[in-house]
Every structure is written in structure tokens, then in C-alpha cells.
Amino acid sequence: MKNATKSRAVELTVTALDLFAERDFASVTIKDIANACGVNTALIYYYFENKEDLFRATIENAITEALENYTNLRKRHDDPVDLINDWFDTNLELSGSIRKLVKVMLDYSGSRISISSIDSEINNFYDVERSILSDSIRRGIEQGIFHAADPDRLALFVSTHLDGIMVAAMIRKDFNLDTAMADLREILWFHLGFLSDRIQTRHRQDGDTA
């Protein structure tokens, strides 16, 4: 019963995330969420004390899901290049849900709401994201795959620019998310002195036409 209850609560937060991302916390009502879920408001109040409690659970569940994806990434790869490539690919594949999460976190950071558990979850999310990158970069340097670099600084650079890419994709109608992600990946490889197959092919083509 506990699992069924938890599952139902998570389902409500998934719909709530869509609405909070589409609009914002202030303009979304419990009734809006209930209507979108096809339930009455009493059911939502059964699981959550109020809208703020639902908002907290929505962000926390979205971050938990993202962190589970990151955990699975670590488990799949021992090779630092493969892990970084998969990290980029995963963020591209899940860009829709990531944009929703970024939008809601952005709205939260600019609001008057302050919930310590949400702040901790957000900080943990970025800590884990950066650690995947910095640990992989560090291992690559130790193995002689990458040139010497500052792993933490590069990880912060990529993480920060990923947020910028996700925001740009929400604002600019003609924005090409695939190209932006590919460019960010290439910038990282250049900083590390590592030429991926895609970059090598481009350089060979440039040389042939020179």
C-alpha cells in the first residue's frame, strides 16, 4: 500500500512539474493541477499539505530522477571518454525534462519562497553533475588520455554552459539544441587536447578543401 501511495504521489508531481514549468508557481493552483490529473482537489490534499508542499515534492522528485540517471551513467562506464560522451548524449535525450526542471528551479530561485530541503536538493544535483565531469576528467588526465587541466574548473564551465543551452532552447525559437550540445562537447575536448572522431573528420575535410 505504501508503494502504491508513493507511486500515486509521484504521478501527481509529474503533472505538477509540467504546469509549473509551463507557467510558474504563483499562477498555478491546486485546482489546475487536479483538473490536469483528472482528480478532485481532495485527493491532492490527501498527499500534500498545500501547494508549497506539492511544489517541494515536485522539485525533489524531478531532481531524484535526474540523479538516478547520473548514477546509472557512472555504473555503465569505466572509460572516462565514454562516460563524458554518454553524459552529453543523456542530457540531449532527456533535454525536454531537463528544461522543465531548469525552468522550475529558475522560477524558484527568483521567488520569495525558501525551502531548505529544495535548496539542498538543488545543490546536491549540481554537485553530482560536476563530480561526474571532474572525476572523469581527472581519471583521463591520470591515464594520459587528456592534457593537464583543472578538472573542477572545466566541470563547472560545462555545467554552467549546459544550463545556458537549456535556457536558450526555451527562449529562442530558432535555437538548435543538437548543434549547441555538440559545440560544447567539442570545446571540452579541445580544452583537454582530445580530438573525437567527429572533430578529426572535420579537420580532415577542412584539410582536403584547403
Name each model feature, range by range.
Residues 25-26, 118, 142, 146, ...:
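Conserved hydrophobic residue
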Residues 64-67, 71-72, 97-100, 116-142, ...:
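Amphipathic alpha-helical packing segments from all-alpha helical-bundle domains
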Residues 22-26, 76-77, 98, 143:
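Short coil/turn segments at alpha/beta junctions that flank glycine-rich nucleotide-binding fingerprints
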Residues 9-10, 30, 52, 56, ...:
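Short, structured helix-loop boundary elements
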Residues 11, 19-53, 57-58:
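Helix-turn-helix
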Residues 57, 68-100, 154-158, 181, ...:
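Hydrophobic alpha-helical connector segments
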Residues 8-17, 33, 58-62, 66, ...:
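Generic hydrophobic, amphipathic alpha-helix propensity
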Residues 93-97, 107, 111-114, 135, ...:
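Amphipathic C-terminal alpha-helical segment
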